[in-house]
Amino acid sequence: MGTAIHNSVEDLCNLDISDRDDDETGWLHSCSRETLEKRWEEEKILFSETPRHPRWKDESFSTALDGLIGAISILFDKAMLPVEGLSSVSVKTWKQVQDIVVATEERLESQCGRLMGRLDLLIKDLEDEVNDSLIVADLKTGKPPEEELSENVSRQLLFYRDLMKQNVAEEQALRAEGWYSYNKSVYR
C-alpha cells in the first residue's frame, strides 16, 4: 500500500497540467483516484508475482486513498495554501503546490559512493525562503508515533539530510521531515 501511495504522490507532483485552464476545478480528486488505482494495480501484480503466503487486500484501497489525500494535505500545508477538498482545488492552486517541489524520488549518494538512499520529496521550505532552505521529506504510510519518532526513523531522516547536504550549497539550510499521511502529521 505504501509504495502505491508514494508513487501516486510523485506522479501528481510531476503531473503536466500546462494544457488545462487555471480556473478549472473538479479534476484533482478524480485524477488522484485514477493515479492511485493505476499504481494500486501495478503493486497488486508485483505482489502476486512474488512468492508469499498473505493475500492482497483489495479492501485496503480506501485506506490508501485516505493516505494519498493525507500526503496531499501536507503538501498544501508546506505550500502555505489552505487545505481544500480535492474537488475544489483549481489547476492554478495545484501549480502553486508543484512549484515548491524541487525533486521526487531522488537518489542520494555520498561523495565516497558507499552510502546511498532515496528521498521521496525535496521541497522548498517556504517558512525560511530567505535562506533558500529545503526540506527532505520522507513519506510514511504506517502508524504515526504516539510521541516522538522511533530511533530508526529518526536515524533514517538524519541520514537522508546528511546525504543531501553533500549535494547542496554550503549556505543552504536543509532539514529532514517524516510525513505521516495517516493523520497528516509531520515530525522533524
Tell what function each PLM region has.
Residues 97-188:
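Mg2+/Mn2+-dependent nuclease catalytic core
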Residues 8-102:
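A non-catalytic, helix-rich entry segment at domain boundaries
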